[in-house]
Amino acid sequence: MIKRLLTLAVLSLPLAAHADEGMWTIDNFPSGTVDDKYDVDVTGKWLKAAQLATTRLENGCTGSFASPDGLVLTNNHCTWGCIRNLSTAERNLSTEGFTAATKGDELQCPGQQLSVLVGFEEVTDKIAAATADMTEAKANEARKAALTRLESACEAASDGERRCEAVTLYNGGQYFIYEYKRYDDVRLAFAPELDIGAFGGDPDNFNFPRWSLDMSLLRAYEDGKPAATPNYLRWRASGPRAGEPVFITGHPGSTDRLLSVAQLKFQRDVALPLWLLRYSELRGRMLAWQYTSDEAARTVQQRILNYENAIKVRRNQLKALLNDRMIARKAKEERVLREAVAADPELQAAYGDAWELIDRSLQTHRNFYEEHLFIEEAGGLAGDLYRNAKTLVRGTAEREKPNGERIRAYTDAALPQLEQRLFAARPIDKEFEKLQLTFSLEKMREWLGPDSPWVRSILGNDAPDALAA
């Protein structure tokens, strides 16, 4: 599970291309630099207000409170899952759009959760103390146990009112406990029809300006009533002025800027090509399947757009990594860093062998990468039904263990969110499940080989489509 962080970026309009580069966590915002450069005093009070007005949707999106009674503004694609789960053959909200005339007309999104970061504590020193003088293998187990204890202590201190998550920054350079207020009742208030919300489709995606109504409105509820949210962002109809600093808060995904050259080459030579080969073909099968029936088209329309978005991202990542000048620049940056480490005896003693250790770990990783991808990461066993079955089986086994010894996704702190996702009343299209499972089993057999013990164990004498049926 990716831990998503609250970060803040600054743009200087009118040209985003002229924006200052970089994102900062709320605890590390460079207020002095911003004041010097833009003559804007970003106070701690302002940062706290922005933090409390920013929401995290548990499907990986960011939103903002836009009213004192729980209204949340987010991107249109962030509500596609909700829209798909609420739609039927008779009422397709994707093509019709949705507007709730009153709060009573708002529709609950199955399994959707929304969180607000209300506090955080750096625990780097505590983790360092818990793992001191240990081998890496033992330190890894001790680290997991310590983070689990800290999560549990955080939740106990709030009498169960808050959800706490351990967050790792900079590949272990810092550790935090993030404390969230979580809303388990999230309802759809407004969404444009897909033809407007994603106007231009894949060709227009990542082109700016883009002429689409890329927004939806949700509402957070508590105890069956709209949540009281006094910290919200006010609407300014006039919009930003040319040259005016604009600050953006959100819960972004991860970046790969800190990867070593060897890790970037692994992405270039192994991970990205394999991903693109698989998902480009899966997209093609979805495109063909959507024409088999109106229901098939409704089921995969938004998913196709999601895959096209991901394919475009990874295709351009690969294009960048195939650029010799880019790799040469990263190699130069790494060389400068290694020379700086070597020049400091203390740093050399602690980190001088880091790059060699990374190289060796990548060699080991390469030896089992495909098996891990197709088996553990379910690249060969796709679909909601398999994912739910795996969660139930593994969750049962993990809950028999002490909390500190469990896989992190099954700790007491993680279970409420896991259970809500697992038991949400989401419709499952059996024909689409067959399509996904058939495809993934075929790819598993193709990449691992028909004589792989894993393939023989899973398929036996069955063909992928027969087993999926």
Model-derived regions: residue spans:
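Terminal presequence/propeptide segments associated with secretion/organelle targeting
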Residues: 2, 9, 15-469
